[in-house]
């Protein structure tokens, strides 16, 4: 199933165990820009569960944490097809203490939303040692009840709840109560309790050199009526409170969502955005003034979504993204230090053996000076979705 642009985007776009190496193909297609594929790994797979939308952080002690969404594999229960909205979708976590060679077999529960399913846990390792994880949710209501809600975003009988954040101060073993961010300025989507939905996003926020957190969120506002756009929120207290800063991207035709943010050595904030109504092209917007404003968005010149940008030891940037067109898989580019060569950077095929377009959503971390791990969700032959990874050698 192809994830609808509004189904994460939530409301914005519908509208749109022990492990081992499992695949060594495509090695001849890597090696570009000093990046070489070593092997693919299965990080977590259970045929009873649909596992998807991971993120990864490397703790100061070297431990790796992978968070992901897990829901029942509904096809095993006799239901038709799969869905990205499920009342039993929870946020889970697995660990590795040996640089990804083995992973904990029994996943730990991060959070179960009391009002519905939880989505896309997006972790960031903060400099104070804590981990901040953003997510969002959907509530399942009876169809007649959902239909009565004013200005709600619906996906069938599901109603969008908006976003929230979770914090752990002990390496992901325990998580504090949810932090509810404010609605985006001008938000027109209301939740089931009659209030504008809290800010939300699927993608990486970043901690700037100034210590502040920068978070690009998706929103359906009155800025461009009916069109999802993106906006910047900033936190000066490690994510406890957030202030609206400025619009990031809006357009009368193109919708934007699922944004990952990256700060370059010169302090430029680069927003890598998923699009709809734009032939699946990546869009990019830049802020040259520490998030006070963004220049007009631009076409990056290639297809793929969503994205994660990882700084390499030499300060170049590894940009990874899902590829939901035949051949389905995971791709990457190595950008210069200021991310200025988007269109000209050679595309690196990490995987092209996916069973359908329902895959991707990669995240990455460095393991050492010359090794990186990219994690994502994957399927073979349209089988049960699982969390996989690709180990890279970096020259």
Language-model segment annotations:
Residues 1-5:
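Positively charged n-region of N-terminal signal peptides that target proteins for export
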Residues 8-21:
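Bacterial N-terminal signal peptides
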Residues 22-26:
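Sec/Tat signal peptide C-region and signal peptidase I cleavage site
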Residues 28-395:
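Asp-box/BNR beta-propeller blade signature and adjacent active/binding-site loops
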